[in-house]
UniProtKB/Swiss-Prot annotation:
This is Alpha-conotoxin-like Qc1.1a. The keyword Mitochondrion does not apply. It comes from Conus quercinus. Expressed by the venom duct. The keyword Disulfide bond applies. InterPro entries: Conotoxin_a-typ (IPR009958).
Amino acid sequence: MGMRMMFTMFLLVVLAITVVSFTSDHASDGRNTAANDKASNLMALRDECCPDPPCKASNPDLCDWRS
């Protein structure tokens, strides 16, 4: 195999890896968004619930880390 052919194969491999990496990154964006939304909801619930003693007592798994 000549040098041009080897270089062409190298470029094709790099292109294929880039395409696969790019598409898999975009596929995970939906999962990341869902996880971020869940974390935001838990933080909002914690901020509202933990200062309230009855709510804090009924949700120890949410509030115990700060006490």
